[in-house]
Amino acid sequence: VGEVFTVFGGVMLAGFLGITQPGSQGVTVPLLATQLLWINLLTDAAPALAMGVDPSTDDVMARKPRKLTDRVIDGQMWGDIIFIGLIMAAVTLIGMDMHLAGGLFTDRSVDAVGHDAQMTEARTMGFTILVFAQMLNALCSRSHDQSVFVGLFANKWLWGAIALSALLQVVVIYVPFLNTAFGTMPLSAGAWVECLGLAMVVLVASELRKCVLRAMRE
């Protein structure tokens, strides 16, 4: 749901974030359709398949049996999904805003590079942040309440899927004809640091949530 909240939030807050098209009265979307399709195919499908062979946790036999009436996705899980989705959207839009003129967190000028180039850079930033945030969330989602660092390297298939996804994301950003297809542009080393730093917020938020759950249970 991270991409859903990103698109919805980007459209609703476009004026505050600088996600606008000069001279146009239409809606300017934060991410393109091809980018959203890439996110769904790349960061959702491969890690999800790899998580299907994730080893069981050590405390699986200590858990209470589920009731026949229990839902597969209960209220608490929906809350977790919405919470992480909102965090993903927030860091994605903040990353975009940092590279747009007229936003909340920057005083950049459009004249320096031109609006189209600036929007492409911002979209590439948001696109990349969301991809890496989804990968980190896949690691965090291995357990509902255990830290991501417990058995971190137990699932080699998941790490393989993440490595492949990261490599393909780099290809989309640096191969010229894919730049045209996906509306991306090469990023600087500093931009990569920003992307990874903002994506890490998802992992930190997930770890804090799990700490609270463990404290409440004890």
Residue spans for each PLM region:
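C-terminal transmembrane module of polytopic membrane proteins
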Residues: 52, 101, 128-218
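Membrane-embedded transport module
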Residues: 1-145
